[in-house]
């Protein structure tokens, strides 16, 4: 009997130890479930931030240059292209003074479309979101064409003659190159910037005008003279003028640029209006794209 009690008393501490060990094991397993390294990570990677199109993320200040290519529509207003040479030929005559013969010819306008290319360079200064700067560009055009007209008029003039004048005229015009010097204003939108431009334009080209002038006059009252009085230049007189013309005018435009590091990309539209020698007006509208480097 005593032996059983001793045995039972000896087993009690062992059972208690076993219970404590089991409790500690369960607690450790429960805590281990909260450690990602032990149960596998359930935390997803954070999504990348959205692109920053806000202000201040791109520095637009600095010098830049690049090349451009586009397509141009050039209009030549040559209506009075031959007026100067006709006026010079008929200067100090009753025909010019009273009939304004030099204003009679009116050649139709013509347009040419062609690919263009060139380059640009400029400098920007950024003030917060506003970007101001200046830019010079060059565009090679090589647009040309010809227009012609003919007209005849008769009138009794103050000198007593019934006078007739026949005119034919031709004007050929060519636009070779255009350069501009412009100011720019843009609004920075991160890596993108819409902008407007305006400034001066100078063009290089040629204007060639020719005219044939023929006149004839008959005394309006021949009964007062014993012999019929008349004059004529029946064969006509050809006069011409060819000038290497420097064209001067203005330009406006608008576009958008994108800046990625030092790479500059742009798309823009530009309008140029210039006056050439010989009463010729040249207008060109160009859509173009460009790429360059910004420092």
Language model feature labels by segment:
Residues 2-6, 10-295:
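Gram-negative outer-membrane beta-barrel domains
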């Amino acid at each position: 009997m005593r032996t059983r009690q001793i045995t039972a008393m000896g087993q009690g501490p062992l059972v208690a130890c076993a219970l404590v060990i089991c409790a500690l094991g369960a607690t450790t397993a429960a805590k281990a479930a909260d450690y990602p390294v032990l149960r596998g990570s359930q935390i997803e990677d954070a999504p990348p931030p959205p692109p920053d199109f806000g202000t201040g993320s791109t520095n637009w200040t600095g010098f830049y240059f690049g090349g451009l290519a586009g397509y141009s529509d050039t209009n030549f207003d040559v209506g009075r292209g031959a007026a100067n040479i006709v006026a010079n030929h008929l200067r100090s005559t009753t025909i010019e003074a009273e009939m304004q013969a030099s204003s009679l010819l009116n050649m139709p306008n013509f347009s040419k479309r062609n690919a263009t290319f060139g380059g640009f360079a400029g400098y920007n200064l950024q003030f917060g979101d506003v970007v101001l700067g200046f830019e010079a560009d060059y565009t090679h055009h090589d647009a040309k064409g010809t227009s012609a007209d003919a007209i005849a008029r008769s009138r009794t003039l103050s000198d007593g003659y019934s006078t007739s004048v026949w005119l034919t005229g031709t004007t050929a015009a060519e636009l070779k190159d255009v350069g501009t010097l412009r100011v720019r204003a843009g609004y920075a939108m991160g890596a993108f910037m819409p902008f407007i431009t305006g400034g001066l334009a100078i063009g290089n080209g040629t204007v060639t005008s020719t005219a044939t002038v023929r006149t004839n006059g008959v005394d309006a009252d021949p009964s007062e003279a014993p012999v019929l009085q008349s004059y004529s230049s029946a064969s006509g007189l050809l006069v011409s003028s060819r000038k290497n013309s420097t064209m001067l005018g203005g330009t406006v435009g608008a576009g958008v640029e994108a800046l990625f590091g030092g790479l500059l990309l742009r798309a823009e539209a530009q309008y140029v209006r210039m006056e050439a020698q010989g009463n010729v007006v040249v207008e060109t509208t160009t859509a173009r794209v460009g790429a360059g480097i910004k420092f």
